Amino acid sequence: MGIGRAYKAPSLYQTNPNYILYSKGQGCYASITGTGCYMMGNEDLKAETSINKEIGLEFKRDGWLAGVTWFRNDYRNKIEAGYAPISQTGTSKVKTDIYQWENVPKAVVEGLEGTLNVPVSETVNWTNNITYMLQSKNKETGDRLSIIPEYTLNSTLSWQIYQDVSVQSTFTWYGKQEPKKYNYKGQPVTGSEKNEVSPYSILGLSATWDVTKYVSLTGGVDNVFDKRHWRAGNAQTTGGDTGYMYGAGAETYNESGRTWYMSVNTQF
């Protein structure tokens, strides 16, 4: 059981009103011009604070380990880009909105973590951990803070064949990933912006040889079954009169295919 309070000061560029960043659109929550926006520092920004709580239960005996932990982080004054423009640039034919960094009054991240370690034999050990997200949202808008898996399971099976040789298999299972509910204009996402990533898993194999007490060699393969996931684009649709780049929802990253590797580790 534990409780703590965290503090995060805004960066220099976020508090300097003379420092301006330009975004092509993804940083503009509700831009009506479709031409991108400027982000201006805000000297009145407050520091982010959070109250972090966790409660856990653990069982340990003869190499066995089982545990579950509930955690919740409540944020106040979380720093994000503003939701509405405070001004526009100059008198040119195409005007550009200007936003400021602002404090989001309240946000919350809450979930469960589980652990299970099993001593299968004197030479084989099986370790597991899982994280399950209950919520991760901006309390002002009700939207998700980021695109993350509903759950992530990591499982490792290790076999110490000889004193100087071991092999290992790793298994990672990612849960469903959902996009944000609203686009950067503050409107509900539609079409391809609602794309989700279905659950998928990755398997890896490796072996390590301790050549001497100072040098070891490791070789292996990640993503044994060559599971591929392709990035389809940015999360949300952007553009204007000259054309659009349609959003891809949660399909915003690549999952590398099968990869072989070898490494040399030394210690002194």
Sequence positions of predicted segments:
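Outer-membrane beta-barrel signature, preferentially recognizing the C-terminal barrel domain
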Residues: R5-G67, R72-D74, S92-L112, N117-P119, ...
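C-terminal beta-signal and adjacent terminal beta-strands/loops
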Residues: Y7-K8, R76, A81, W173-K185, ...
